[in-house]
Amino acid sequence: MTKQPEDWLDDVPGDDIEDDEIIWVSKSEIKRDTEELKRLGAEIVDLGKNALDKIPLDADLRAAIELAQRIKMEGRRRQLQLIGKMLRQRDVEPIRQALDKLKNRHNQQVVLFHKLENLRDRLIAQGDDAIAEVLNLWPDADRQQLRTLIRNAKKEKEGNKPPKSARQIFQYLRELAENEG
């Protein structure tokens, strides 16, 4: 009996893999992953030297990134493609985590500034009650200095003058927060 055309597939040597073990990836998904890695590479290239030092990169990838930072226009685009290709051959999860940590630190700083601004506004509006809250947060805060700054800020607000003392209150609160952390 002659073999049917589909029977020759059964005789391929080394074909021990079951069909359910194979994971098929579409061409579109591969392209999306490639583009995402290129964007990741571009984000890394846009970082400054200090931030770049905090990201775990091997020597080849770091050299490619430093070269891309010096190149302009079309050469930069090609270099970013090369960086994307290099990232495809590496485990990018530690790089992503370090990048997220850098971005998150900035977001945390913005949130802290908003909290300090709200606390400053409460200090000006409520006075001694808010001072007690500040002293609970930072026991080493100077009560007398805060009272003086609050009194000056209220006078400036009533006289429609620039909020010099309000800025000083914010700076003082920021110093307290930085000394704590």
From Swiss-Prot:
Keywords: Cytoplasm, Ribosome biogenesis, RNA-binding, rRNA-binding
Compartments in which it is found: Cytoplasm
GO CC annotations on file: cytosol
Main location: cytoplasm
Matching InterPro entries: DarP (IPR006839), DarP_sf (IPR023153)
NCBIfam families: PRK05255.1-1 (NF003593)
Protein name, as recorded: Dual-action ribosomal maturation protein DarP
Organism, scientific name: Shigella dysenteriae serotype 1 (strain Sd197)
